[in-house]
Every structure is written in C-alpha cells, then in structure tokens.
C-alpha cells in the first residue's frame, strides 16, 4: 500500500496546533483585554494563527479533487460528532462539573449546535459538493479555471478588503471561501504547480521565495493592524470607520494577505518530500482534535478554567501559558481521539453493525452517484 507523502500531513498538524492557539486566545478574551507589550505579542500570535484554517481548506481541495466521494467517510464524520457530543455532555452532566438542568442536558445531546463547528459545517457541504466540483475541475481548461479562481478571489476577498467590508462581506467564515480555496488546491494539484511554478529555480531557491512571500505578507498584515489603529485615533469619522473596519479585517479569513500566507505556506511545504508513518497517523487524528475542543460545553467552560488573565500575569508568563495550554489541549485531544477510534473498531467488529452499515451506505451511495 502506497504511503501518502508526509509534507502536507505535517502541515495539517502544525495548522491544527495554531488553530488551538487562536482559540485559547480569542475564547479567553485576551486579544480584547490585553494592553502594551502583552497586547503586541498576543496579536503577533493571532496573526501567526489566523491563516491556518485557510491552509486546511487548500489541503482539502488538493486531495479531494482527485478522490472519489465516499458516503461512509461522511457518515463516519457525523457519527464521530454525535459520539463526542453525547459522551462529553453526559460526562459533565453526571460528574456535575458543569451545571445542567435535565432539559438542558437533553437539548445538548438531541439537538447538536452545528454553528459551533462552522468549519465542519462548511467541510460537510463542500464534501457533498465535491463530486460536482471535481467533474467541473476535470473538464474545464486551465485558463477558465484560473479565471474562475481570480473572479472568486475578487468577489470574496479583494473587493471586501478594498471597500472595508462594504461589498460581499462574508468574513471568510463561509462555504464561498471554502469553495474558492478548494479550487486553489485543486488547481495546484491538477497542474502540478509544485514542480512547474518557478521551474527555473532549484529547490532551495523556491523555498526561499515561498518563505519570503509568506514573511512579507505576514509583516504586511502586522503593519496593516497598526496602521488601522492609527486611523482610529484621527479626528475624522471616515478615517475612523476605515480604521475600525481594517482592525477587524486583519483577522478575517477572506483577507487577501491571509490567503497569500496560506497559499505560500502550502507551496513551501510542497517542496518537502518525505514520508513518515507516525506523522501521517497523528495528522489523521487532528480533525477529531478540532471537534473535541470546539464542542459547545468545552468551548464555553474550558477557557474559564484556564484562568488566563493579563491583569495578574506578565506578558512573558501569559505567552508561555498560551503555548503550554495549547500543547496540553492538543495532546489530550489526540489521546481521546485514539481511544474513540479503538472503541469504534471494536463496535464495527460486531457482524450486525457491519451488515447494517453496509446496507445503509450502499443504498444512499447509489442515490448520490454522479454518472
């Protein structure tokens, strides 16, 4: 069996780590409550974290554009979400760690709040669309696909940025954004841009170019933030409005600089060619990490328990704590996901379960085939 190359799998792991960094900071309110040097370093961490969701979207397009739609994969994801929602809420309800009324508990396990997992929501929709997107990608010519990507980026990234969010303002938390970056990943895969792009340069030179693009775009976003803050302090309603819009826009997934960072980082990792079974295995678990730590009851309580406060701790201590808590959350969620997989494997060994699963998948799969 061919082992998948580990360059993008390593990127998945790194990206999930920084997504957790983002959540630790934002769910704790640190970006709002911090001041001075602490605020500076927290914002640097946020700006190092914001583009990693877009990286995930590109990776999805890169691989899924050459893969077949598998209903079992979708059903497995939905089952995983339901499992964690039931187990986590039941654990906190029984132990009393989190206060529930009986009605609250029943609501939490029977009516799942998909909006809490907006990325998973978008992923499911894009996965359902993938047979149709892939048919289009396979049949369209290169120029047309490139033009489509440009139009999508203009509509959902560049125009909103230039107009301070007055046009097509989706913030990037949408299926539109996911489909756009799906096409970007598919384009890179279909036309082998990792080899073709900058082909006059050797590997080391390519890496330097991609890294330079990444650093310049990241620094540009940092400068944008401080320029926007400067505008908010001027005696002009118009400039204040633009400044306030840009302060927020730096953290939008549709920010052109964020998209450039994600693409350049993806291309940089495309220059690394190696395989590692351990990295691939851990990478296969990271979606579970996202689901666990973003489940409503975890998200609404965990960051209060962490008790991160800029009022009682110095900037250095708070940054160290952010990284430390991120590592703990990542490792604990990985271990939980390993246990969950073992449980599911044991359940699937039951003959009746396999039979029901096979019949259900075959029935629905036949309904959804794209001929």
Predicted regions and their residues:
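Alpha-helical transmembrane segments and their immediate juxtamembrane cytosolic regions
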Residues: 1-371
């Amino acid at each position: 069996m061919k082992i998948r190359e580990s360059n993008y799998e390593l990127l998945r792991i790194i990206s999930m780590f920084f997504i957790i960094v983002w959540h630790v900071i934002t769910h704790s309110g640190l970006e709002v409550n911090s001041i001075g040097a602490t605020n500076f370093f927290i914002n640097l961490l946020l700006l190092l974290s914001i583009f990693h969701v877009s990286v995930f979207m590109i990776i999805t397009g890169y691989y899924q554009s050459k893969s077949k739609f598998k209903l079992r994969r979708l059903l497995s994801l939905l089952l995983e979400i339901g499992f964690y929602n039931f187990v986590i809420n039941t654990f906190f309800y029984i132990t009393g760690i989190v206060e529930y009324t009986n009605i609250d508990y029943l609501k939490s396990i029977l009516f799942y709040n998909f909006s809490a997992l907006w990325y998973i929501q978008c992923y499911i929709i894009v996965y359902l669309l993938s047979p149709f997107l892939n048919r289009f990608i396979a049949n369209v010519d290169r120029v047309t696909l490139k033009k489509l990507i440009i139009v999508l980026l203009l509509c959902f990234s560049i125009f909103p940025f230039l107009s301070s969010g007055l046009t097509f303002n989706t913030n990037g938390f949408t299926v539109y954004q996911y489909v756009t970056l799906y096409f970007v990943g598919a384009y890179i895969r279909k036309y082998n841009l990792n080899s073709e792009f900058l082909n006059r340069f050797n590997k080391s030179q390519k890496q330097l170019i991609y890294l330079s693009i990444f650093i310049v775009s990241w620094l540009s976003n940092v400068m944008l933030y401080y320029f926007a803050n400067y505008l908010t302090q001027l005696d002009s309603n118009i400039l204040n409005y633009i400044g306030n819009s840009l302060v927020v826009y730096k953290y939008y997934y549709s920010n052109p600089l964020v998209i450039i960072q994600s693409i350049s980082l993806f291309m940089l990792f495309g220059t690394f060619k190696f395989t590692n079974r351990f990295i691939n295995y851990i990478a296969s678990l990271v979606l579970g990490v996202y689901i666990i730590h973003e489940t409503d009851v975890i998200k609404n309580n965990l960051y209060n328990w962490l008790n991160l406060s800029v009022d009682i701790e110095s900037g250095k201590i708070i940054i160290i704590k952010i990284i430390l808590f991120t590592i703990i959350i990542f490792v604990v969620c990985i271990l939980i996901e390993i246990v969950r997989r073992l449980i599911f494997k044991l359940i699937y060994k039951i003959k009746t379960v396999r039979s029901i699963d096979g019949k259900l998948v075959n029935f629905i799969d036949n309904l959804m085939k794209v001929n």
